From Swiss-Prot:
Listed EC numbers: 2.7.11.1
One example GO MF annotation: protein serine/threonine kinase activity
Subcellular location: Secreted
Function: Acts as a virulence determinant.
Domain Protein kinase: 136-408
Substrates-to-products reaction catalysed: L-seryl-[protein] + ATP = O-phospho-L-seryl-[protein] + ADP + H(+); L-threonyl-[protein] + ATP = O-phospho-L-threonyl-[protein] + ADP + H(+)
Active site (catalytic residues): 270 (proton acceptor)
Protein name: Protein kinase YpkA
The species this protein was found in: Yersinia pestis
Superkingdom assignment: Bacteria
Binding site for ATP: 142-150, 163
PROSITE patterns named in the record: PROTEIN_KINASE_DOM, PROTEIN_KINASE_ST
Length: 732
């Protein structure tokens, strides 16, 4: 029997006997998931996973091996669950396991594929669209936490969000659907709350998956929208009245949603920037994701630590409308203040007042630099934040009371004006150059790395979801490209993530080759439907993305991205060729995709080879230039350092003082130029050759670390030579 890994253990609150009893009573649960002592555990692929609803798989790595290394209590819940699972496996015969679908046998296996046909599962809600002829428009538009978010398009061109759990968790989606049904029945639908239709079976890669379907909100998340709105205000595109009036409009809309939920006795528990989407067409904010909802007075299933109200800690008061009001205000504070620039500051900590020093520091040009979460004076805005986030739950206003606060009552603008400003922000002149404005953080790369390791573990147990891993890899290539451009992630982490991606491609190729010997086994053959769906939902989006990449002008900094894209195309070809050899006639559609992949690979190879040859040529030129500087570099560097350390600096003065200052500077410049006079022509010729090369090399990160070091050395030498060449023009 394979060992069982424990992740996310916790102090004991249940006996071994009760754990056995719990499993025996609930062995028919469809997911291998347990709820013990208010904590949820997920069991899949021979692992017992403590379900952490805030960060999903990124936190599952906590506690791995602690049980078996003796570092945790022998009587902890996780150990009890492990003993229970071992006992269950020993006491359940192989024959019985094979006869029990979705029961104990699935506690030790991979997520089974549903046998239900495509379409609605059960009765959808009133007004649900017809799913006959639906297709996958976008696979994994988002992949956050425990869910895949894909886009399904009906034959009438209506776009629906399909929320698919990464592991066996039908119960979670069903519970979320039931919450929406209860709200619709009790309080009615709300224009600023997600519009859900029901559970359905949808295509996903080469599988069929059960998903919660809802209307797509085409737009941006809260942080992106308000960041762009703030930029428009700073650039003078809108005035202060329009900016703050729009903020107040958003606050009123979100508080109207929390009031609506309260009428149904439901608490959201996870309102945050990522769960508020602004509709591009209407400008309206829409609250999404009731996955962590609870009834009023109950302990929440989970929360996001940096936004939650203080009363939601373990063992404290239950969730309420007032805790949702807290979430709305901490969300607004996060977006207004720009807390993403400093992840050490949490929005639920509120504003910090500073009176002993300026609330804003100045940059080198004398302009104020905003410090997130810092306030220097009291205003209606700061009082609003403090009156919500700085008081206990008993003293905190509910939704309607919060809407009457002076900050939200004064200085408002009419709704149509606010919505027009938001629509312009999302679609008009105020839009940023790219709609993908969310920065890639170190935490995001760690989460993606954990997801890749999960796929690698599945490959080791011969349970790899080929469509899922290739779709995730396509998403990760985009994320890594963006992280390299932004420069906000340590280069060692980027290098490690890049290595993990390339390793995953090698594992996929080995996995496919290892399965080739099984192609005569009918159980491993892929149906024409699944092959076609794989091409449409996995291959097609990758081809379109890479083709756009190929149409762009590239620099040396793009070599790493092109290498990864080339590997992605190679792997797609390997997988598709293998699928084409599994006994089924090769369709014209398959031939078409194979030809397109091959053509894209050839074009990409040509561009990559050209760039690599140009880079090798640049390296040779760089080496020659650095060697040329050897005759003057040390003397020039020392002369310039002496000039900088001895020249008089005058910030202000009369015309007479300014003239004296200029005479002194000219004297110092003459001395410095005399020291390097024999190298003047060499330095001038050096800069003529080095500046075009530096432009070609750029400033971005490059795969060749030695080349980066040499580039920066050339940049320093060019700066020295340029400054010395300018001294005569500037001062003499």
């Amino acid at each position: 029997m394979k060992s069982v890994k424990i992740m996310g253990t916790m102090p004991p609150s249940i006996s071994l006997a009760k754990a056995h009893e719990r499993i025996s009573q609930h062995w028919q649960n469809p997911v291998g998931e347990l709820n013990i002592g208010g904590k949820r555990y997920r069991i899949i692929d021979n692992q017992v996973l403590r379900l952490n609803p805030h960060s999903g798989f990124s936190l599952f790595r906590e506690g791995v091996g602690k049980i078996f290394s003796g570092k945790m209590f022998n009587f902890s819940i996780a150990r009890n669950l492990t003993d229970t699972l071992h006992a269950a496996q020993k006491t359940t015969s192989q024959e019985l396991r094979s006869d029990i679908p979705n029961a104990l046998s699935n506690l030790f296996g991979a997520k089974p594929q549903t046998e239900l046909p495509l379409g609605w599962k059960g009765e959808p809600l009133s007004g649900a669209p017809d799913l006959e002829g639906m297709r996958v428009a976008e696979t994994d538009k988002f992949a956050e936490g425990e869910s895949h978010i894909s886009i399904i398009e009906t034959k009438d061109k209506q776009r629906l969000v399909a929320k698919i759990e990464r592991s066996i968790a039908e119960g979670h989606l069903f519970a979320e659907l039931e919450a929406y049904k209860h709200i619709y029945k009790t309080a009615g639908k709300h224009p600023n709350l997600a519009n859900v239709h029901g559970m359905a079976v949808v295509p996903y890669g080469n599988r069929k998956e059960e998903a919660l379907l809802m209307d797509e909100v085409d737009g941006w998340r809260c942080s992106d929208t308000l960041r762009t709105l703030a930029d428009s205000w700073k650039q003078g595109k809108i005035n202060s009245e329009a900016y703050w009036g729009t903020i107040k409009f958003i606050a009123h809309r979100l508080l109207d949603v929390t009031n609506h939920l309260a009428k149904a006795g439901v608490v959201h528990n996870d309102i945050k920037p990522g769960n508020v989407v602004f509709d591009r067409a209407s400008g309206e904010p829409v609250v999404i994701d009731l996955g962590l909802h609870s009834r009023s007075g109950e302990q929440p299933k989970g929360f996001t630590e940096s936004f939650k109200a203080p009363e939601l800690g373990v063992g404290n008061l239950g969730a309420s409308e007032k805790s949702d009001v807290f979430l709305v205000v901490s969300t607004l504070l996060h977006c207004i203040e720009g807390f993403e620039k400093n992840p050490e500051i949490k929005p639920n900590q509120g504003l910090r007042f500073i009176t002993s020093e300026p609330a804003h520091v100045m940059d080198e040009n004398g302009y104020p630099i905003h410090r997130p979460g810092i306030a220097g004076v009291e205003t209606a805005y700061t009082r609003f934040i403090t009156d919500i986030l700085g008081v206990s739950a008993d003293s905190r206003p509910d939704s309607n009371e919060a809407r009457l606060h002076e900050f939200l009552s004064d200085g408002t603008i009419d709704e149509e004006s606010a919505k027009q400003i938001l629509k312009d922000t999302l679609t008009g002149e105020m839009s940023p150059l790219s709609t993908d404005v969310r920065r890639i953080t170190p935490k995001k790369l760690r989460e993606l790395s954990d997801l890749l390791r999960t796929h690698l573990s599945s490959a080791a147990t011969k349970q790899l979801d080929m469509g899922g891993v290739l779709s995730d890899l396509d998403t990760m290539l985009v994320a890594l490209d963006k992280a390299e451009r932004e420069g906000g992630v340590d280069k060692d982490q980027l290098k490690s993530f890049n290595s993990l991606i390339l390793k995953t491609y090698r594992v996929i190729e080995d996995y496919v080759k290892g399965r080739e010997g099984d192609t005569k086994n009918s159980s491993t053959e892929v149906s024409p439907y699944h092959r076609s769906n794989f091409m449409l939902s996995i291959v097609e989006p990758s081809l379109q993305r890479i083709q756009k990449h190929l149409d762009q002008t590239h620099s040396f900094s793009d070599i790493g991205s092109l290498v990864r894209a080339h590997k992605h195309l190679e792997t797609l070809l390997e997988v598709l060729v293998t699928l084409s050899q599994q006994g089924q006639p090769v369709s014209s559609e398959t031939y078409g995709f194979l030809n397109r992949l091959t053509e894209a690979k050839i074009t990409l190879s040509q561009q990559l080879n050209t760039l690599q040859q140009q880079q090798e040529s640049a390296k040779a030129q760089l080496s020659i230039l650095i060697n040329r500087s050897g005759s003057w570099a040390d003397v020039a560097r020392q002369s310039l350092q002496r000039f900088d350390s001895t020249r008089p600096v005058v910030k202000f003065g009369t015309e007479q003082y300014t003239a004296i200052h200029r005479q002194m500077m000219a004297a110092h410049a003459a001395i410095t130029l005399q020291e390097v006079s024999e190298f003047t022509d060499d330095m001038r010729n050096f800069t003529v050759d080095s500046i075009p090369l530096l432009i070609q090399l750029g400033r971005s990160s490059l795969m060749d670390e030695h080349l980066v070091e040499q580039r920066e050395k050339l940049r320093e030498l060019t700066t020295i030579a340029e400054r010395l060449n300018r001294l005569e023009r500037e001062w003499m």
